[in-house]
A protein has these predicted regions:
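A short alpha-helical cap/connector motif
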Residues: 1-194
Length: 194
């Protein structure tokens, strides 16, 4: 749990679970783009199972670490994460689920830009946690999730207020400029889009 808290704070975890609980009443499945070790994935699956709702959790990750940064990721606050950093194997995530006894989610191994929205994503999405750390990953995640987001669906983007990772904020701000019907609320480093 210690490594997880370095990535997502206690307060952010509580907010994520609070919003995911609200999304249980919304049509569609839960998705997480950028699952890393599966910490939030385990929490989301447990929430779904405890709710007795017929929802699935879908996880997406390259399981090859981060892609190369782009100019949109340049930060004057210092450098955080390099290409291939945050590497965790798909097998490790699967094993973590098996150890907990939770149902294994749908797990797709690929870089986000290689996903096919028609075949790789659920038909409807109630809740999306986007944790790709970089501009291109968040921009692509938003473009994949938005057409499938249910009315009252919720998207959370991690690292919005992280000065060492400005890419997510740039991607979210561009998205909101093109999609003014969405609202943005901020909580620590989470961008809450609904």
């Amino acid at each position: 749990m210690k490594d997880f808290l370095k990535q997502v704070s206690d307060q952010e975890t509580k907010k994520l679970l609070e919003l995911a609980t609200l999304a249980l009443e919304t049509e569609g499945d839960f998705v997480e783009l950028g699952c890393y070790r599966g910490d939030t994935s385990l929490l989301l699956e447990k929430l779904i199972e405890n709710s007795k709702k017929s929802k699935k959790l879908w996880l997406y990750d390259s399981f090859a670490g981060l892609p190369e940064k782009t100019k949109e990721d340049a930060s004057v606050a210092g450098d955080e994460f390099k290409a291939s950093e945050l590497f965790v194997s798909k097998r490790e995530v699967v094993e973590r689920f098996k150890k907990t006894g939770l149902k294994l989610p749908v797990i797709k191994k690929n870089f986000f830009e290689n996903l096919n929205p028609e075949t790789d994503l659920p038909e409807k999405i109630a809740f999306a946690f986007l944790d790709g750390d970089l501009y291109s990953s968040i921009k692509t995640s938003l473009s994949l999730v938005t057409p499938k987001l249910s009315d009252r669906g919720i998207m959370l983007v991690h690292d919005y207020n992280n000065p060492k990772l400005p890419g997510p904020a740039r991607a979210v701000d561009e998205f909101l400029n093109k999609n003014p019907n969405f609202r943005l609320n901020l909580f620590e480093t989470l961008a809450i889009i609904s």
